[in-house]
């Protein structure tokens, strides 16, 4: 006997998308992205290109922030911090306060571990496992790098609007468009 199609609401769809991303980053995704953002040679060509591109983006953002001056007087939110690729060097440059969050508890734990290895005192970066929509507070600069590839366009647009509301001065966002091809290759 055929089953009736299940109707869902936009809120249910959004919750399902978020749960799917979270589950991915607590398992296979954590292993994959932790390896990409490490110095391991155990990456394929696409992953190596992602690593190189991400590092270029981080370097460009850090250079721009330094050009703005007074890092020590400014507050930063690294939304979707992953393993700390931006938050850690930002702390090393003397940034005032840094709130770094990621949907994945595993990513946050790895970021904390890497910060400790880099000699960053725990009080220098406030790490939090949180989805982007739940972030609150006001920051001079909110930065969200390479997160939105994991979301369809509509939820990504809503997240950008939310992050813009947290930024006093600057919102810095980078992304690759979500496409089925990129989703498979990542």
Region annotations inferred by a language model:
Residues 167-177:
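Conserved beta-strand signature within the Rossmann-like core of class I S-adenosyl-L-methionine
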């Amino acid at each position: 006997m055929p089953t009736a199609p299940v109707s869902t609401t936009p809120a249910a769809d959004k919750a399902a998308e978020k749960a799917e991303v979270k589950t991915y980053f607590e398992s296979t995704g954590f292993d994959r992205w932790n390896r990409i953002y490490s110095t391991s040679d155990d990456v394929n060509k696409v992953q190596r290109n992602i690593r190189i591109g991400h590092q270029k983006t981080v370097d460009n953002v850090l250079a721009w922030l330094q050009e703005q001056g007074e890092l020590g007087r400014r507050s930063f939110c690294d939304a979707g911090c992953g393993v700390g690729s931006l938050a850690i060097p930002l702390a090393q440059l003397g940034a005032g306060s840094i709130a770094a969050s990621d949907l994945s508890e595993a990513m946050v734990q790895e970021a904390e571990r890497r910060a400790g290895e880099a000699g960053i005192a725990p009080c220098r970066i406030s790490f939090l496992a949180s989805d982007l929509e739940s972030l609150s507070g006001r920051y001079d600069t909110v930065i969200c790098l390479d997160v939105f590839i994991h979301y369809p366009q509509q939820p990504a647009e809503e997240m950008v609007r939310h992050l813009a509301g947290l930024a006093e001065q600057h919102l810095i966002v980078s992304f690759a468009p979500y496409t089925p091809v990129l989703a498979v290759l990542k």
